[in-house]
C-alpha cells in the first residue's frame, strides 16, 4: 500500500497511523477551514507523509458532502476560489508543492483547462468517481450506464435522506421521489402537551395520542383521511405519516438491515 485517502468526518489520527507504517496519506476535505483544523491539531506533526489533499466539492461531488452550517446547500459555490483558498493556506505552512486533488463534477479534463499548469493553484490532480462506472470492466447494469450518460439538469438531487443525516447527492430516482413525498408528510410532535404543542391527535390502530402544533393537526388529519394512518417516529422528534402497507415494508427493511 503506497497511500490511503480518508474522509468521513475529521480524520485527525490518519496522519499518525499512516506515518507509523510509512504510507502516504491523502485527507479528504471540503474547505480550507477543514484543512486548517486538521493541520493545526494533527497533520503538522506528520507533514513528511502528507502525499496530497483531496478537495471534495460539497455541491459537485456524489455521495455524502461536507457542507458546513455556514454554507447553503441550495446555493452552489464556484470550486475555483475555494481550492485557491486551500492552496494559499497550504502554501503558508510550507505545502506549496503538495498536490491538491480536485474531486466532484470531473468528467472531461477539457472542462478544467484553466486549472492545469495554473501557477496560482500549483500542482493539481483530478479524481474521477462516476466516470469509471461506464467502463467495460464496471459490473453495474447497462441500464445504469445508459442513465449516467443521459443525465440532464435536475436529474441529480442534493438531499438529506441518508441515515447519517448529512447532505448527499444522488440521482433523482423514483425511490428518491418517494422519500420526498414521505418527507412532506412529516410534522414535529411531543408525547405530552408542551409549549405550543397542544393539539391532540390519535394515530395508529391503537389510537396512540400525541401532541402537535395546531396548524399541523389539520395537515395530519388530511393525511390520515387519505390513507396515511401510521405515524412513524424519527430521531428528530418528528413523525412521518405513511400507509399501513408502507409502515410494514419499512419495518421489514429495518429488521433485514440490522447489522448490515
Task: Give names to the regions the model predicted.
Residues 28, 56, 103, 128-129:
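Generic beta-sheet signal
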Residues 60-77, 87-97, 109-260:
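Conserved active-site-proximal phosphate/metal-binding subdomains
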Residues 101-108:
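A short glycine-centered flexible hinge/capping loop motif at secondary-structure junctions
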Amino acid at each position: 500500500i503506497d497511500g490511503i485517502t480518508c474522509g468521513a468526518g475529521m480524520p485527525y489520527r490518519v496522519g499518525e497511523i499512516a506515518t507509523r507504517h510509512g504510507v502516504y496519506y491523502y485527507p479528504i476535505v471540503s474547505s480550507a477551514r477543514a484543512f486548517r483544523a486538521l493541520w493545526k491539531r494533527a497533520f503538522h506533526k506528520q507533514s513528511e507523509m502528507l502525499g496530497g489533499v483531496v478537495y471534495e466539492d460539497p455541491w459537485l461531488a456524489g455521495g455524502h458532502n461536507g457542507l458546513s452550517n455556514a454554507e447553503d446547500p441550495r446555493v452552489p459555490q464556484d470550486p475555483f476560489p475555494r481550492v485557491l483558498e486551500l492552496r494559499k493556506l497550504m502554501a503558508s505552512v510550507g505545502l506549496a508543492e503538495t498536490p491538491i486533488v480536485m474531486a466532484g463534477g470531473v468528467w472531461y479534463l477539457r472542462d478544467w483547462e484553466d486549472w492545469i499548469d495554473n501557477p496560482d493553484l500549483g500542482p493539481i490532480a483530478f479524481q474521477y468517481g462516476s466516470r469509471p462506472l461506464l467502463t467495460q470492466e464496471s459490473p453495474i447494469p447497462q441500464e445504469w450506464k445508459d442513465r449516467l450518460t443521459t443525465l440532464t439538469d435536475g436529474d441529480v438531487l442534493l438531499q438529506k435522506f441518508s441515515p447519517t443525516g448529512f447532505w448527499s447527492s444522488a440521482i433523482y430516482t423514483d425511490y428518491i421521489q418517494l422519500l420526498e413525498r414521505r418527507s412532506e408528510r412529516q410534522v414535529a410532535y411531543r408525547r405530552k402537551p408542551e409549549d405550543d404543542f397542544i393539539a391532540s391527535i390519535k394515530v395508529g390502530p391503537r389510537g396512540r395520542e400525541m401532541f402537535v402544533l395546531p396548524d399541523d393537526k389539520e395537515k395530519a388529519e388530511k393525511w390520515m383521511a387519505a390513507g396515511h394512518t401510521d405515524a412513524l417516529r424519527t430521531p428528530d422528534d418528528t413523525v412521518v405519516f405513511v400507509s399501513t402497507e408502507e409502515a410494514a415494508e419499512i419495518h421489514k427493511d429495518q429488521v433485514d438491515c440490522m447489522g448490515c
